[in-house]
A protein has these predicted regions:
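Pore-lining transmembrane helices
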Residues: 1-40, 47-263
Length: 266
């Protein structure tokens, strides 16, 4: 048979511990690489054997004696506070996870929010509802903005190449991929990112407050059949997407009128 390694019980520090130890380990390896000087013929030994062995020993000891107890204490405290706060705690959690999910669309903050959300969901502390809704709201909202901008303002508020990308972003959103909205954030972060976050926060929190629940750790069409109160869940997505679209259109129009936004498709 095949031997598989697994923990006998979940590591209590979860994502928080992993984040701390990964940062510390990275700086440790950098420091050791600078301080440990060996002859040239031993450089390969240093980089492929010595540094990995020393850093692995350090990580093992630090995790066992420091990070796991400390991270577990922090993680346990967060869970206790959220659980004790009841519905208010669940709504605060939903707002925080939604904001972190929408702010950088698959970037490091988004991934951190995902690890936290999946950790809480795996341990059946809080569902992953807000996280999953916040993934799809920005791209749907941005795609919608490229459709309604001219109808609302009488002007095209995006450069020509962004219009087809808006439709692509909407399609990818239904696959659970938020990165389709990244080109809009790169082109004008001051109009896109706040709109993503506000739409995601309002839509996700509204759905959670009205009783939508998702425990399955996926997003979009892959998870929708398993959602409790799917109608409320979809209404939250629609609400968030509309808010995102209207905010983007309004902010871009204001910037255009102030001469701070150049548009090649007018």
């Amino acid at each position: 048979g095949t031997m598989q390694w697994e923990t006998s019980s979940p590591v209590p520090s979860t994502f928080i511990g992993a984040l701390i130890i990964s940062i510390v380990a990275g700086y440790l390896v950098k420091w050791m690489n600078q301080k440990i000087q060996l002859p040239d013929f031993l450089l390969a030994f240093k980089t492929t054997f010595l540094l990995p062995i020393l850093s692995a020993i350090f990580v093992m000891l630090a995790m066992y004696y420091v990070i796991t107890p400390f991270g577990g204490w922090i993680n346990g405290g967060i869970r206790t506070v959220l659980t004790a706060a009841g519905e208010k705690g669940a709504l605060m959690y939903a707002m925080g996870i939604a904001a972190a999910t929408a702010i950088d669309l698959g970037g490091p903050i988004n991934k951190a929010a995902g690890f936290v959300a999946f950790s809480f969901t795996t341990d059946h502390v809080l569902p992953v509802t807000a996280r999953s809704i916040a993934i799809v709201i920005p791209p749907i909202g941005l795609g919608l903005a490229t459709i309604i901008d001219r109808r609302l303002t009488g002007k095209r508020l995006f450069n020509a190449q962004l219009y087809p990308q808006g439709k692509t972003a909407m399609f990818l959103a239904f696959m659970g991929i938020s990165e389709g909205a990244i080109p809009f954030a790169l082109e004008s972060p001051i109009t896109a990112i706040p709109s993503y976050m506000v739409g995601a926060i309002v839509g996700s929190t509204a759905a959670v407050w009205l009783g939508a629940v998702q425990w399955f750790p996926e997003s979009a069409i892959w998870a929708w059949p398993l959602v409790t109160n799917l109608g409320v869940y979809m209404a939250g997505i629609a609400l968030g997407a509309v808010i995102t679209a209207l905010m983007v259109v309004f902010l871009r129009l204001m910037m255009f009128r102030k001469g701070k936004l150049l548009i090649d498709s007018l």
